[in-house]
Amino acid sequence: YKQRLVDGEDIVCDLTGGLGADSYFLSLKVSRLIYVERNASYCDVAAYNMEQLGVRNIQILDDNAVALLIERPEKLSGVNVFYMDPARRGAGNRRVFALEDCEPDLNELWPLLCRSKCKVIAKLSPMLDIRRLLLQLPGIREVHVVSVRNDCKELLLVADLSCVPDDSKNDDVVP
């Protein structure tokens, strides 16, 4: 389903690579994909899997998404779409769903992404208040509610950050 949200000419950066499943399927549709993951062992698994699957358009980066956006943006040259699926497990492997409890915290990441003026696709918990998300994160153009057999599994936010003013801030209090 997520493949429908990207085009063949897109250069996508998956900022939360994990084991690489989403990166793999997105890579089948786009010209190039940059996979970013801070866990080196996950990077190794993803690299091995991509090689076994014959994927040649993925670059694996063992890095932290926030640090990469701030300190090494040149590694993201040409990227026009950012994808992320923030980890929704907290201490003791407990499920979390609030943006600020996920890793990375999308509230922290959003201002950095706004500077890119790119498209952003974020996979989030279906427990989130959509109205609040629209107020919290500027530039959201679409919200996809993904369900399987009438069971809501996830929300997919699609944002066009080229429309967000440079002085836009996320420090407003949201009800």
Predicted regions located by residue number:
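Conserved class I S-adenosyl-L-methionine
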Residues: 9-18
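Conserved SAM-binding loop of SAM-dependent methyltransferases across substrates and taxa
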Residues: 19-31
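Hydrophobic anchor at the start of a short beta-strand
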Residues: 33, 58, 120
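Class I S-adenosyl-L-methionine
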Residues: 83, 88-175
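S-adenosyl-L-methionine
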Residues: 1-10, 38-78
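Conserved SAM-binding motif I beta-strand of class I
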Residues: 32-38
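Conserved acidic residues
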Residues: 10, 31, 80, 118, ...
